[in-house]
Amino acid sequence: MVKGLEKFNELVESFANLPTIGKKTAIRLAYHLCINNQIDGMKLAHNIENAIRFIKPCEQCGALSENELCEICSDKERNKNILCIVESPKDILTLEESQSYNGLYFVLDELNEEKLEKLKQIILKLNISELIFALTHSINSDATIFFIEDKFKGLNLTFSKIAQGIPSGVNLENVDLISLNKAMNFRTKI
């Protein structure tokens, strides 16, 4: 760090603390905002402040929201009978971008009694008929799915999870063995 440039150094450090931003990129960003484009820098600072002040978890599903209920939970056009369980609000953003799902969500960022009770109340209140698990494939997620399925087996639900296998455009030699095994065992007829 350069002596006499404490504010610049603090900005570089703040950028470097963000995921996927290394020190060189942090320096480039700080320089760009302080020297090349101060207007963008002020706009960025304002947008960051507003996001921190106004974005919070949806009270029902845990998605990012500026209101008590997010746009998804408030949308009357959504399929209210299907609930997709995800690990984080970022997963909702990804699924929404894919435009492949039109139901509701529930963020299960941690498995505890409070979360399970909240999930159960949503299932009962909305008369959910299917839970879709869209969790990162791991032994822990398989255990979580099994646990929730066992806990809610008396609620007349259908349980499913998103398909896993080989990503498009990836050579077989580059696929991990678990994904390859899943792809073979859950193959579809053509």
Swiss-Prot record:
- Give the boundaries of each C4-type zinc finger: 58-73
Signal peptide residue numbers: none
Q: Which Pfam families match?
A: RecR_HhH, RecR_ZnF, Toprim_4
Per UniProt, the keywords (alphabetical) are: DNA damage, DNA recombination, DNA repair, Metal-binding, Zinc, Zinc-finger
Q: Listed GO molecular functions?
A: DNA binding; zinc ion binding
Looking up InterPro entries in the UniProt record yields: DNA_Rcmb_RecR (IPR000093), Rcmb_RecR (IPR023627), Rcmb_RecR_Znf (IPR015967), TOPRIM_dom (IPR006171), TOPRIM_RecR (IPR034137)
Spans traversing the lipid bilayer: none
Question: What biological-process terms (Gene Ontology) are attached?
Answer: DNA recombination; DNA repair
Q: Which residues form the Toprim domain?
A: 81-167
Q: Which PANTHER family match?
A: RECOMBINATION PROTEIN RECR
Question: What is this protein for, i.e. what is its function?
Answer: May play a role in DNA repair. It seems to be involved in an RecBC-independent recombinational process of DNA repair. It may act with RecF and RecO.
Instruction: Give the record's family classification.
Output: Belongs to the RecR family.
Q: What is this protein called?
A: Recombination protein RecR
- Organism from which the protein derives: Campylobacter jejuni subsp. jejuni serotype O:2 (strain ATCC 700819 / NCTC 11168)
- Recall the taxonomic lineage recorded for the source organism: Bacteria, Pseudomonadati, Campylobacterota, Epsilonproteobacteria, Campylobacterales
